[in-house]
Each structure stands twice: as C-alpha cells, then as structure tokens.
C-alpha cells in the first residue's frame, strides 16, 4: 500500500478540521478541482466510508484515495530538478525506459508542474502542494519559462520575427502567444514562453521548416538551474519558495 509519508509531526494540524478537497491538495495528492472530481466519483474514503463533497477531516481521520492512504505532511516542499535527456516524466508511458521517479529519492511524494518531453532536458519544479502545482500550470497566469534551443539550420531574422509574433499551430488549432526570442548563435536561440502547449517549441519551429536538435529549460518563473547538474535536485530556499508562492497568488501555510 502506497502511503504519503509525514515529513514532520504537528499535533495542532491533527486536531484542525479542513475541507477534504483542501486536505488532499495540501498533501500533494492533486489539485482541489481534481479532488472534487475524485470525490464525486466515490474514489475517496474517510474512516472506511465513501467521502462526501464538502465534508471536513483532520489528521486523525483515515483518508484514502483508492487503496492509497493519505497522511498529512505539515511542511510544504518544492524541489528544483535538472531532468536529463532520455528521462520520461509521465509514469503512464508503458515504453518509458527511465522515469523521473527513479531519480528522485525523497521522503514525501512530489508531483511535477509542466512536463518536459523525453528528448528535452532542464528544469522541473516538483512539490507536495497540489494547489501550487495547479497554479504554476494554469496557462492564464502567464508564468514565464525560459529555454535554450538548438536547431538544424541557420537562424534568420525572418524566423525570429515570426516566432516572436505568435505562430498558428495547425495540429492544436491554436495560435501561440507573442514571446521574447533572441538569437544566441548561428543555430541557437533563447525563448521565453508564457504558456505550456504540448511540444510547443518543437511545433513552432517545424512550422517554419526547422527541426529542434536540442532543448533545455533553464528557468521557471524565479527559479533557475544554477548549481544543478543533470540528474540532481535541491530544495528551494525559503526566500525562493516564498516568492514562488507569492507570484502564484498563493499564501504558504
């Protein structure tokens, strides 16, 4: 049986009653919206009975999602991880040779915000706070993500201009938001996006006949790869974490 392990004990939290969707989000299970869906589908139990939407629970209650027991983690955790190339984010990929969960050994279950495809590398943020994950991934918030990109042929001024103005992606039937882009070499550029469409940069480049040969995410909001080597991770500093929560419009509790 999988268990969300307690990072530190806090008697006051055991006594405090909170709505069950918030309880699940606080402990890194999912966002509140996803929690409401799980509750509506009868997949959450409290002390052996099916939980109801809007009911309140505390640390003494036995809360399960399916067969997985949820225990309260008093401390909010955010990790910065340097994902190497060849590593898959999604645990649902049956063909994945190596998962990020194989590389991160941490005492609390954490979930990533904004995946990178297998052939991409760079910064992933992971947390046990479902509300933070949801806030970081919400496209309407316009959070910045910065990338270094290498393509297969020489970059032109026309390419940069069109990429920066927004690109219609036929497969997704959407036009990307205008973005900041800067040439850094004959075949390389840096780009700052404020949305996270599936394989967005690769699709944008392909629209103009370019193929991406290397893609690295170097920044998410105020967090960078500084000090990290491929495959390594670290906890955010208190200052970094406080700013991240503030920029997401959340209060860390």
Predicted regions located by residue number:
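Basic polycationic patches enriched in arginine
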Residues: 5-6
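Basic, flexible Lys/Arg- and Gly-enriched helix-loop patches that mediate nucleic-acid binding at interfaces
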Residues: 9, 14-253
């Amino acid at each position: 049986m999988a268990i969300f392990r307690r990072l530190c004990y806090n008697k006051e939290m055991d006594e405090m009653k909170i709505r069950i969707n918030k309880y699940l989000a606080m402990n890194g299970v999912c966002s509140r919206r996803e929690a409401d869906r799980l509750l509506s589908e009868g997949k959450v139990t409290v002390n052996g009975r099916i939980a109801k939407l809007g009911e309140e629970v505390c640390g003494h209650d036995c809360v399960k999602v399916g067969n997985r027991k949820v225990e309260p983690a008093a401390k909010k955790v955010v990790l910065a991880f340097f994902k190497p190339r060849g590593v898959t984010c999604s645990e649902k990929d049956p063909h994945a040779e190596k998962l990020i969960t194989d590389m991160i050994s941490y005492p609390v279950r954490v979930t990533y915000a904004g995946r990178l495809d297998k052939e991409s590398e760079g910064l992933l943020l992971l947390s046990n706070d479902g509300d933070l994950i949801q806030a970081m991934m919400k496209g309407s918030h316009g959070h910045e993500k910065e990338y270094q990109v290498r393509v297969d042929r020489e970059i032109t001024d026309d390419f940069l201009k069109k990429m920066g103005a927004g690109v219609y992606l036929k497969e997704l039937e959407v036009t990307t938001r205008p973005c900041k882009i800067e040439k850094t070499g004959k075949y390389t550029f840096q780009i700052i996006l404020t949305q996270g469409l599936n394989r967005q940069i690769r699709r944008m480049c392909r629209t103009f006949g370019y193929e991406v040969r290397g893609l690295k995410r170097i920044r998410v909001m105020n967090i960078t790869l500084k000090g990290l080597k491929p495959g390594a991770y670290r906890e955010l500093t208190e200052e970094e974490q406080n700013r991240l929560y503030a920029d997401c419009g959340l209060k860390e509790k």
